[in-house]
Amino acid sequence: MKTLPGVVLSWFGPPASAYALSFATSRLGSASLSRLVIVSNRVPVPDAAGKGTAGGLAVALREAFQTYQGIWFGWTGRVAAQPSPEPRIVDKGGMQYALMDLTSLDRQEYYNGFANRALWPTMHYRVGLSDFSRADYAGYLRVNRTFARALAKLVLPSDLVWVHDYHLIPLAAELRPLGLTNLIGYFHHIPWPAPEVLGTLPGSTDILRSIMDFNLVGVQTERDADNLRRALIQELNAAPQKEDVLDADGKSICVKSFPIGIDVIDFQKVAARPRPNRILGQTIAGLGSRKLIIGVDRLDYSKGIRQRMEAYEHFLASNLDQRGQVTYLQIAPTSRSEVPEYETLSRDVNETLGRINGSLGEPGWVPIQYVTSSYPRSLLAALYRLARVALVTPMRDGMNLVAKEYVAAQDPLDPGVLILSKFAGAAQQLTGALIVNPNDKLEVAEAIRDALRMSHKERVIRWQSMIGPLRDRDVSWWATAFLKELAAQQRTTATYPN
């Protein structure tokens, strides 16, 4: 197996850094160091206080990047009338960022359009919500081409390039004709659907062809990997070679699952020592002797928030003795407000919320507390630890790190209960959760009842069965495993027209 070329992996803090540093030392010796080039749709540049975006991808990758000599390339999130074709280089916190602005048309076609109105719903099995536009698809390809031209000038021959998520699937196909033979990896954070579902999207065959220009494609679960392999075989006549490797059109690609993790030890520390916080204090005071049920999701139709509220309503209707004894806190920061489907979702959720609270609420008790603002990581950790039950019931989800954070945040002596959708990637690892079908409101309602009634002994046993695997496959394991596999691949030898 090839050694990892120049990759220093001591980025995650103890004890993960001890393993990572040992790995780097044993594999590299005195070899000259190359860089890691991370590419993502949005770049979480730290603010003046040193804080960056709190999204799951940003947190996971920042952990990897902090002690690494490399570049993080992507969109600033801003639009400009005439953005520069060259990236703006920013050095902050010992890290280097290469930042691109987009035009308003770019944002509409690339981001709001094809990425989030066509790819996103299709990847989440919501083909009825997919809205394909040739103009949007052209804009999606155009922005990837613009990014590739800017990025190619920054990449050194020995660099490892790590591309993230569905916005940037064509990026390697745009980089190769510019002369890049580097090892380029891609990690797909959301579900990869069955070939029959992906095939409903116009342009899906071209998407698969562009995938072949990566050396390694990582997905969250083995089910996702199998779906992608089957699609490549069916649509491109790809020929399986050795394990996980397929050849098509003179190119070779490795497809493997790498379930993303969290920094378990750090999250446990944050949850165990909560900072004084007004919201936390008010929540504790407002609960009194009631048990807390919590849900934390970005407001998205894939998360099943409305269906979850209706299941909770069914639970209250079927368990009259629980009225006034529990409170369900749903934190759902709004997102993608410029996409019509999200405006519709917001109205639907608010109507459901109003109906439930209006029909079941009592003086001094509101069944559902609903918050649309983002909470900092430290506050979320404290709320997870406070909650007896977590409802993580997406209709589809690549992984769902909230489920893992909830488990990590628990008091080992008095843990809560995780209710988890069978369609979340995390369900493959967190088998100690109460696994449910989010489409079955009765099943979810019964799981809520069972979770609240569960004995202390069973809660501890279930939690212990989950925390070990989380520690074993944390975010350090994820990044190390992916980059090690990428470095083991053969460099690209295919020829491309200029």
Question: What kind of feature is each model-predicted range?
Answer:
Residues 1-7:
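Extreme N-terminal basic, low-complexity initiation segments
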Residues 11-12, 18-498:
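Catalytic cores of carbohydrate-active enzymes across secretory and cytosolic contexts
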